Amino acid sequence: MADKNFQMSTGVAAVVQKVVEACQDESKRLDLIEVAKNYPPNQLRNMQRTFQAITGTFLDAFLKKHLSKDFETLVLMLYKPRAQLLCELIRGATKGAGTDEKCLVDVLLTIEAHEVREIRQLYYQLYNDSLGDVVRKDCGNKYMWAKLVNAVATGDRIPRETHELEEDLVLVRKAIETKGVKKDEVSTWIRIFATYTRADFRQLHRMYAVKYNGESLRAGVEDEFQGLDEYAFKLAHDFLYDPCCAAAFSMNVAFAGSGNDSDRLNRITAMHFRECKGCKYYYKKVYGQAFDERCTTELKGVYGEAIKLLWEPVTVPLLSMEDCQGGEHRPMTLEL
């Protein structure tokens, strides 16, 4: 039946065989990571269909049978279509009695504008529910991180005119200079982080540094918030400026404390290892330690090797803010 209903190339069949062997032989576990890293998502989906046709088993079920713990969770995430993964993470964070605030922050504050629109549609198709309504109901509107997440989940990013940037420059300065957390100032940050395009935010960043003797917007965020609020607003800032910055920041937070946060390590890695090519560069530049060294210290066995392998070892950042591909600004890594 499989031969009749599924035409498969020798290449895809070979990948399926590689996945099977990697699951069954512990010494070949990292082959699962190599496949996820080297094959684009559309080819991975084709491989999964071929896997089921050959073995008669869903890939997820096969992986769960042979893998365990953090490595299993990571691999399962890597082999899911991105939009499906994001929806499942959000669903898992909001269902049940409690809310996984950290997961909602990590997911909703580090996806691009076009993805937010796509996720809204897919979420409704999968769960017959509105993403915005679910997030709003689960997070409430009491905490500042929740207000920010709600704004991102329901808003749209709109290009600004020069005069609008100049007006916001004044409001941002006022927010930074205001002692204590005030409603109007928080609203300014939320509006900017939830509705600015990346190009406009980078321009605002440059304008602020020029006008205020090299001061950084991020420093203002650091002084403004605490706890999860601080993490959320820093993450939103970094992602809007450059996804590589956000990935490095979040991974460093996951490493901090008495034990590392493997849930966050898995989320951020699975979501961003493909496009954030400058993460390791930025990590070393900001945190003073090579990313691979930190992984070796904090993580054990094949799981640690997998995390290191997925993030590419880039030593030189992309150089130009004006360097574009297909009309989209390419992520870059600069000093904040």
Q: What name fits each language-model region?
A:
Residues M1-L336:
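Structural signature for extended repeat/solenoid scaffolds and their inter-repeat hinge/linker regions
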